[in-house]
Amino acid sequence: MNSAEQTVTWLITLGVLESPKKTISDPEVFLQASLKDGVVLCRLLERLLPGTIEKVYPEPRNESECLSNIREFLRACGASLRLETFDANDLYQGQNFNKVLSSLVTLNKVTADIGLGSDSVCARPSSHRIKSFDSLGSQSSHSRTSKLLQSQYRSLDMTDNTNSQLVVRAKFNFQQTNEDELSFSKGDVIHVTRVEEGGWWEGTHNGRTGWFPSNYVREIKPSEKPVSPKSGTLKSPPKGFDTTAINKSYYNVVLQNILETEHEYSKELQSVLSTYLRPLQTSDKLSSANTSYLMGNLEEISSFQQVLVQSLEECTKSPEAQQRVGGCFLSLMPQMRTLYLAYCANHPSAVSVLTEHSEDLGEFMETKGASSPGILVLTTGLSKPFMRLDKYPTLLKELERHMEDYHPDRQDIQKSMTAFKNLSAQCQEVRKRKELELQILTEPIRSWEGDDIKTLGSVTYMSQVTIQCAGSEEKNERYLLLFPNLLLMLSASPRMSGFIYQGKLPTTGMTITKLEDSENHRNAFEISGSMIERILVSCTSQQDLHEWVEHLQKQTKVTSVSNPTIKPHSVPSHTLPSHPLTPSSKHADSKPVALTPAYHTLPHPSHHGTPHTTISWGPLEPPKTPKPWSLSCLRPAPPLRPSAALCYKEDLSKSPKTMKKLLPKRKPERKPSDEEFAVRKSTAALEEDAQILKVIEAYCTSAKTRQTLNSTWQGTDLMHNHVLADDDQSSLDSLGRRSSLSRLEPSDLSEDSEYDSIWTAHSYRMGSASRSRKESAPQVLLPEEEKIIVEETKSNGQTVIEEKSLVDTVYALKDEVQELRQDNKKMKKSLEEEQRARKDLEKLVRKVLKNMNDPAWDETNL
């Protein structure tokens, strides 16, 4: 190995020169190009003698800056080591490079002889300098470091004169970054197939062949014998030689990096709080609630990070063999877990505030000195905790990589890595769950009944589970939300456009039983009770199961204390007990009917005060609160408007998206503008309304016939399904059951079939109601309830005949006319643009033809 090769290896070993991944044909040319700007030279001297370089240009842009770096290196060498150096212009211009090379070889020898490159190699001019190589103080450093460095660059030329293949063992883990590289773990055995100078070898491991860094491995031999390199100048180190010095130096470098980045992260948190969030808290830009969402528990996290920095500093003051970095992290892990999980749970609400008030917050941030756009600075600042949390496993992995095998802190470092990985994954899960929870609380829920969901209180816990009712083998995906007094069940619509209400379970009298894993279920628990039919709930993970069991058991104890006595007639209407099915109150006094439904039934207080009278409903379906019967009870569910259906199909034609994108925010109801209001007030609009009224009156004249026909259909269908109705009320109740069953399982139906089932249930209700009207009330016609048959063509070309209310049909037609007018305006505008473009093209063509016909035009004009 010649002097150029030795110098390249020396610089790479010290970490001041990047190792080339390809074979170097001429080491001298490579070295000359690497040293030309003087950055490597300054980095080398700063590594050997920290603090000797006063000024350096890390990225020189011109000749003067390059020469300045070289002269700074020469000045420091002359002042500190009194070496015979070279001329700066010679190195920059590529002249007399032998003199430059000779100076570097001399520098290598001098620093090795005086013991530099060991204690001083990784020392930094920092107030947090770490003690290193304490165990080396009893040994002489004379010529030892030279042999240490030689043992490193000896690996670059480890060919043997014998025909036996070179076998090496990995000292560190290596992960490939290119396709032609070879990945391996610490301790793996690699068969070397090609040895090249420059720091990279080719080898085979587990059937794969690729390139790997030679300083990541060591040779496996029965006895260490002198190697015969090409130059014949370097020998293998003696048997008792210590090969851990450089690993120790890297360990201290990584530890120093952890400490410095921890300082920087703590300062960034304090800056965000003092510069932006605290002034925002005292201003009137946002309400106090929104400001608290933005703040979260960032104050507590900032205080905790300062404590963590102090603990790490105390740890680094100890000798290396007594440092307990992993133990420091493990001792603070419970507090860190609590703080970061709370921050993750609040972050979706903070993002919602950022989105809603982005303009105001952006202006406020820019007034406080933030760069434009100011909202981006705040968003990045609030994301700092997640970014830092993701870096801990990587930093600790690097620290463990350069740690001695028998270091007492190795086991704690490995435990800390696992703990941080679990915490990071748990934080991501909490963020996703809270985003979904916020979406459920802010968007409309289909088929919702009762008070608004916000009146139920705060959500204690929620997740996606699989439920199975007693006596049924069918499993359904559900979203469970636990509120202070009840458990809410939702399902996602078939097209993932929103959520569908499925029912509520009161926590009063609820019993939670954790089940052992079996072939049929894993991570499952059972919900039961005197008023509740058994429900089997399967969770996605063991952690999710633990959370549900803990929260539900705690919740049931709280509700039991607050409600010591439970009476059947005082049960809320939105409950799911399991009672025998009784068709009417008439059977309650006689022998009970042995009917055990495979789904949950809902208690309904009897009109006569009998607590035993129950009315069956569909699985997990809410009952309707008892109200005085009126004609408005016959109103159907809102029909699917054609314009909304078309938009819905357009969304389905796009590529799949994430759950968040598949559940978009509901489009707000269209409000009439001032222009529309004025039109409605006009005489023409009044005449149009008069015409609509005439059409309604014409259809009302045939209402009696249609209702009689619906009654006939209803009776036939009831007989077909063996449903008996003794009076008007039981008839309506049985129809309610059919209505619930018709929309029971949205996961098995399309959106169109779901709405068809709603219209079918409406027809049953209309038929039964018409019979009641004949017997007890005079004929009353409501325009909103009159139906017409509409023939509609779907997007797939299929023609469907639907029944819609007259008023909804008229307004749908009005919307379609409005859309046609807008399309007509767009087409007219496009036509005008096309005409203008054609005229411009015609002028251009005429001009070109005129020039071509001009006799003065010839090839000389080209």
Curated annotation (Swiss-Prot):
The SS bond pairs are none
What modifications follow translation? Answer: Phosphorylated on Ser-673 by CaMK1; enhancement of GEF activity and downstream activation of RAC1. Phosphorylated by PTK2/FAK1; this promotes interaction with RAC1.
- Where the record annotates domain PH, the positions are 452-557
Biased-composition ranges for Polar residues?
572-585
Q: Where in the cell is it found?
A: Cell junction, Focal adhesion; Cell projection, Ruffle; Cytoplasm, Cell cortex; Cell projection, Lamellipodium
Chief location of this protein within or outside the cell: other
In what ranges is there compositional bias, type Basic and acidic residues?
670-679
Q: Please list the residues that carry the modification Phosphoserine.
A: S132, S155, S164, S228, S236, S497, S673, S776
The UniProt entry, under Gene3D superfamilies, shows: Calponin-like domain, Dbl homology (DH) domain, L1 transposable element, trimerization domain, Pleckstrin-homology domain (PH domain)/Phosphotyrosine-binding domain (PTB), SH3 Domains
UniProtKB keywords: Cell junction, Cell projection, Coiled coil, Cytoplasm, Guanine-nucleotide releasing factor, Neurogenesis, Phosphoprotein, SH3 domain
Task: List each copy of the DH domain by range.
Answer: 250-430
Q: Which InterPro entries match?
A: BetaPIX_SH3, CH_dom, CH_dom_sf, DBL_dom_sf, DH_dom, GDS_CDC24_CS, GEF6/7_CC, PH-like_dom_sf
Coiled coil stretches, renumbered: 804-854
Low complexity bias (residue ranges): 731-744
Molecular function via GO: gamma-tubulin binding; guanyl-nucleotide exchange factor activity; protein kinase binding
Q: What is this protein called?
A: Rho guanine nucleotide exchange factor 7
Source species of the chain: Mus musculus (Mouse)
Q: Which gene encodes it?
A: Arhgef7
